[in-house]
């Protein structure tokens, strides 16, 4: 999805954008991959971006291996790569790697999160449990739990 808006704040024009792209691809009957990119940001044309307009990121939705909303910046991007294996039952396992940055060049300054996940999918809900580590604190892993209702 893509969202772009703009306007005036305190006499300065701004543009705010949000972009999310993902592609899912089967490798074999039981093995699949996912590539995802999220970018959000705001740019003020004649004044600095106020901290109240910063974007928050980190955690299960954007950069696993870190606390929920651990980082804030005028803009950020996170790229994710996942490889998943689906058993014959409703259980799926996956390995993942997230790389995030608050700079345009994601390779220059970044945070890494990586780990393993387990999901159970049924007709009523999806339960995901992911254990993630970061490149800044290998000894402090994060457990991310997500429950999604499928009503």
Language-model segment annotations:
Residues 1-9, 37, 62-69, 93-105, ...:
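Transmembrane beta-strand segments that form the barrel wall of outer-membrane beta-barrel proteins
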Residues 118-126, 139-151:
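Outer-membrane beta-barrel "beta-signal"
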Residues 23-25, 83-85, 118-122, 133, ...:
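Residue-level signature of outer-membrane beta-barrel architecture
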Residues 28-33, 89-93, 120-130:
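Repeated loop/turn-to-beta-strand initiation elements of outer-membrane beta-barrel proteins
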Residues 1-87:
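C-terminal outer-membrane beta-barrel translocator/porin domains of Gram-negative envelope proteins
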Residues 82-113:
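C-terminal hydrophobic structural anchor segments
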Residues 38, 42-45, 49-51, 99, ...:
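Outer-membrane beta-barrel domain signature
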Residues 15-21, 75-81, 99, 112-116, ...:
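Hydrophobic, lipid-facing positions within transmembrane beta-strands of outer-membrane proteins
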